[in-house]
C-alpha cells in the first residue's frame, strides 16, 4: 500500500520522515533524508499455504483471531501503513548507531522562523533541571507564553505532590526576576502519563511547543495521543492528515501517527504537526537554550554510560540512599564516574544524595580522583593483568583525567540543604549536618561547557508555596516569599588557585548586579559575621541567578 506507492508519491510531492520530519529522498545515499525502500520477502508457496489453511481451518482460525488478536499477516499489513523513516533515524533508533554530525544544534532564531508572531507558545522545560532550561528570550517575547514543566516524576513520587498551586511560585519568581506576567503553568510526566489530560485542556486551538533538546516535546505529543487515540493523528500538511483505515487497533494507530522519540539530542530536524482532538500542535525542533553549552558528551563520556544518563527515569532519580562525606584539609571529594568532583569544606559533615545513574566514589582529593581516571586508561592494564579495580566506576574518557578540563564552581553560602544542578547530567542534594558553624565554601568541579546552578530543594519550596497560597488564596503571599530571599542562584566560577573565594564572590556578585541594583541584598552587613551565625531563616547571601 504506502510502500508500493512511494515512487508515485515522490513523483508529485515530497513526504517527510516520520521520526525527524526531514524531507525524504532516495537518490543521494550520503545526503540528508536518505531512506531505503523496504523490500518485502517473496515466498512463492505462502499464498497457496494460506489458501489451504483457510479451506481446512477457516472457522477455527477466525475464532482464534478473536481470542488472541491479529495474526502475523495482519500485523505485517499494519506495519506497511507506518510512514517511512530516514536511514539516520532508523540506525539511531534501532541500532544505536549514529554520527553526531547528523544531529546539529539549532538556535532559537532557526526554529523561530516557523513560529508566527501571534502564535501561542508553550515553553517546555524539564522540572528537575530548573532554573536551567527556561529561556528568558522566550519568556520575555511578545508572544503569549505558557510554561509546561516536564519530567516531574524525577522530582516528586506522585502527581498529587505537584498541585496547580505550585504555579504561584513560578509566577511570582518570573515576575520578580524577569518582569514577565505568566499565569499558565502545567506540570506533567509523559512517561507516567501524569497530568496529561490537564495539559491537553490547557492547550489552545493551535499551539507551538518550544524548548531545548530532550525537553520532552515529542514525548508529550505521544502522551496526548494516548488520551484520545482515534481522535489524534499526524498531519502530512497543516490541513491534511495521513490516512489510516478505520478498523485499526489503538497500538497500530499510535504506531502510524506517533512522534519520533529518542534520547539523542537534536533528533527532530523539521517542525511536525499533529491534530489532537481538534487542537493543532506544532512540534518544533529543540534548540540550544544554554549560553555557552559546548561540552561534547559523545566524546567525553563512555557511550554505555551516556545512554544510561539520557535514559534516567524516576527509579534512578528518586533514590533515597545518601553518602556521608567529611571535608578534609586535603580536599576530600565525591564523584560519580569521574564526571564531576564535589568538595565540601574541611571539618564539615555532609550527606550527599545523587539524582543520576552510577555509583558514587570518594577520593582523598581531586588530584587523586584524576589520577585514577588516567590510571584506568594506562598501558599497564591488558588482558593478562586485567583491568583497573575501579574501572567499572569510571565513566569518562581519558580527556577528563586532566584538571585543566574542569571549571572550579564555588557555591554561595547556604544553611541547611541545597540542590546542585548540572545541565543534562543530574543533580545532587547536599545536607550539611552537625551543629552549625561556617567553615568555608562548598565547591563542585565540573567539565568546561556544563552549566551549574544551585537552588533550595524543590520539594521544600513547593511545600512552603502550597501553605502560603492556601492560607490566603492569593499569589501575594507567595510573592512575599520571593521578595524576602532568592531561591535559585548561579555558581561562581573561579581560578583553580583562588585563595579567598568569599572576597572574590562578593566582587563577582557586585559585577553581576551592576545593571540591577535592586537585586542586591545585605550589602550593609559584614558577610563573614552574617554567615557565621545560624539564622532563624535562610539569608542566602550572594545568591543571584543569571538569566
From Swiss-Prot:
GO terms for cellular component: mitochondrial inner membrane; mitochondrion. One of its GO terms (molecular function) is GTP binding. Residues 105-290 form the CP-type G domain. InterPro entries: G_CP_dom, Mito_lipid_metab_GTPase, P-loop_NTPase. The keyword Protein transport does not apply. Keywords: Mitochondrion, Transit peptide. Residues 1-22 form a transit peptide. This is Genetic interactor of prohibitins 3, mitochondrial. Belongs to the TRAFAC class YlqF/YawG GTPase family. GEP3 subfamily. One of its GO terms (biological process) is maturation of SSU-rRNA. It comes from Eremothecium gossypii (strain ATCC 10895 / CBS 109.51 / FGSC 9923 / NRRL Y-1056). It is found in: Mitochondrion. May be involved in the mitochondrial lipid metabolism.
